[in-house]
Amino acid sequence: CLVVSLALCVGCLFYYKYFNFLGETLAALLDSFGLHYTAPSLDILAPVGISYFTFAALGYVIDVYRGRQRAEKNFFFYALFVSFFPCIVTGPIERAEHMIPQFKTPQTFDYARVSGGLFRILWGFFKKFVIANTLGTAVDAVYGNPGYGAYTGPILLLASLLYTYQLYCDFSAGCDVALGAGAVFGFELTENFRQPLHARSFTELWRRWHISLTSWFRDYLYIPLGGNRRGKARQYINQLVVFLVSGLWHGASLSMVVWGLLNGVYLCVGKATQDARRKLTRHNPLYHFTPVRRIFQTAVTYLLFTSCIIFFRSSEVFEGSKGIADALYI
């Protein structure tokens, strides 16, 4: 029963989101060896939010199998959980144990909750239409220009840094609207972003960025693969696998695969060099000055994350790599 349920969920996601991508990738790979292959292509429109509600459904099936969640006998409560409209476009990815009991609890009007929810919605709209769109205009003036290669390194670097903040505002704004809408209807949703761009390490950043997705991968992929229980090498491999899948979840393209793997590499390198970096900075008096240390750590984390985010905007791996090289004068 578990295998059938997982196959149905993953099969639907593969059919709608990854069939064409894998066919095109296989064709390109064979062409590089001089073998001509025409990949079949499906002219289909994927359901809105398929990545989100598929993961919600997968989490439910696995939790029921593990005994963490009772199988819901009322189909309508299950359907409401999987397709709860505030969550299916930008998340958060909720768990059945968190949402279904709320659906079954009678709701009463709470002025503070409703007004707080409406304010959260307005804040989300402000972040999206004022902050993100304004930053997007500046970023598009550089990266949206076919001749953007003529720009100097500092301009490209500034555009890249702004794009990271634009993406954060864009993405978190959708979650703000979702959480606000949930509050208006009487439901508490999971916080998905906790000021991730203020993080001082890559590990901390991924504890604050897209929290519901990160925790989903931790519980349903990273830990089942062995987590950190089988030695350092296996831990790093597991982390790379998780971020590879995360990249594919965000988008069916090679640039998203690179985005995921690059995040995983930074995370692994950061953990592998943690002790060495502490020894290196132990005798630096400036580094012991807390404000300087915090600013430096936050700036480095932001820059590294930006080098990943460039692939989010790029349709091709080469384009993303060129953007990084140009920004650094390479």
Residue ranges, per PLM feature:
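Membrane-embedded transmembrane alpha-helical bundles that form the catalytic cores
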Residues: C1-I330
